[in-house]
Each structure stands twice: as C-alpha cells, then as structure tokens.
C-alpha cells in the first residue's frame, strides 16, 4: 500500500497510526520497541525515525511505501 505525505518526512510512529497499522500511539511505541517493524528491510527500534519518499515500512505482513 502507498501512503502519500505532503511534508518532507513523517516519523515512524506517526506513519503506523496514519496508515492504520496500529490503533494508538502506545501500540506504535510498543511494536517498534519490540523490534516488530522493519524500515527498508531492516528492523528499526527508533520510533522517531524520519521516513522520506521511497522508504518502505513492513509490519504484521503489510508493507507501506511512502510517496509524495
């Protein structure tokens, strides 16, 4: 699935909520801290990681690509 952003970047925890992959910010924080989220194919535990156009995020079998 593609997620279009209108800003230069979106933070990882915000993307998970925006794409409806998690229900709350607390849930986003938990799944990121547990190493359940991949950014560009690598596990990422930084919830404030800035994602830019072209980045991909995978969680729970779903992949999201950032577009602009």
How would you describe each model-predicted region?
Residues 7-50:
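A basic, amphipathic helix-loop patch mediating RNA/tRNA/ribosome contacts
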Residues 61-66:
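Short, charged beta-turn/beta-strand-edge "cap" motif at the junction between a beta-strand
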Residues 1-2, 68:
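Absolute protein N-terminus
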